[in-house]
């Protein structure tokens, strides 16, 4: 039982989380508005999401009237400029720019002419990129790869592409002119104002004329009605704004009647036992007991990996998922930069490259910086606890984002159990299993992993005694940070034997849990063996087998790149009812990581090949999926609102 002092300390920590979360939300909103990025705020995203379908419909209706000859000459004049742009793209661009300009802190930003010009310019920029895509698709793709992600902002990206296209003698884009841009922007702004008039309301935006000296200037301003919506969205966001950290005492138990986890959660209701679930559903006793059980496991920081991380952060050295901010120095200026035009151009180009790299460093290092902030807060805490909850599928997830067993390789390496287990011969085998698996032998038979660990005592000794000096020995392995933690634990518990208790976490993972469950439901022995439900001489790899089956049916240009990584997310998610649309994204992203661009047609063929391969390799689970889909469709047609069934087990 926690003492009153410990409870007070935890309540104070949660109040700090609430305070800091609110401050971060408000500071982030304020910073985005200062930078004219209100479209990225919480209220901006929610509002655009709500208004976008109505605006798309209005633009489509207007386009249809063109073909019916019902629009005036004024619209036909600007229609030519967006003829190649689908209504969804035009609507998204117009809404983004409207929110950015109207809620910007910059003086005059919300003048009607300024807003219309910004919308028209952004639409022209998009059309210009599509023009380059039609004229020189291969060149544009190369330029994007080499320059796009290095640039600091949207405008700079476009400028880079324009400059490089001009150097390649691509026919120059014929600019629309400011007058036409403003006309186009004004029409889209009118569409936004009209579309926001829900149920004959006053709408979200209106034109407001101000007399400034001898001039009359029109501004676009939010209506009182929208300000009420904005305040409501922000108030709702603040309920979920508190930061989520580990707890200093055991989390409250979850029940069907009371919220668990954080002490103040019962009052704040910021976290549900089932995320995105139906609040009317009653959860069973077994899953609730499971959730409450894992919340009582005490953890602490691993002083060895924390010390190594702090030193590498000081050195600015990247290792695996540990990405500290690396400072890129500007090149020295040439002595004749003032007189020598070529030297000046070369310097400016090199300086821009360095500035682009530095800009990306801050983004890239975000998770590492936040993890190290959490480390500083909990470094001197003897033990802490993780509150957990379910998602709507029944999978358990930690509520905090950092210092949890489901973190990155680096994040996981920072944790050990607060209470150790006495070393036994079985414990030695499990430590050997962990150090070999994280080194990269995760597909090797168990005996091979144990043997490898026994043959590499010298490696573990070198790494444990001088991890920084021997960085090349461990930075390139499969999971470098967990390997580092395992090597140090194995060294002290087995090689040196100066530790009688081990606190290291040993990770074992299900092989495609969706297929495992469906294999059991279908009593499919071959699939059960393929996903390691049934024992075998060595670990089976379902992803590799599906990839090999699918490869001959993929486009020839894609076949050399097909492997388990390309199909993994598809095979993992199909048992959870993932459809071809999401499959396309997974395969496209996996190929992009290999530097491979795939056309729409080839992507369609590849997705079909992978799904057909699953029908061949895992027929039982796929048949169960098909049966469930058919039964659900039949039930919906019959008017059912929910389904209940019993599994064969």
Where is each model-derived feature located?
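Non-catalytic nucleic-acid-binding interfaces of large nucleic-acid enzymes and RNP effectors
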Residues: 1-571, 575-649
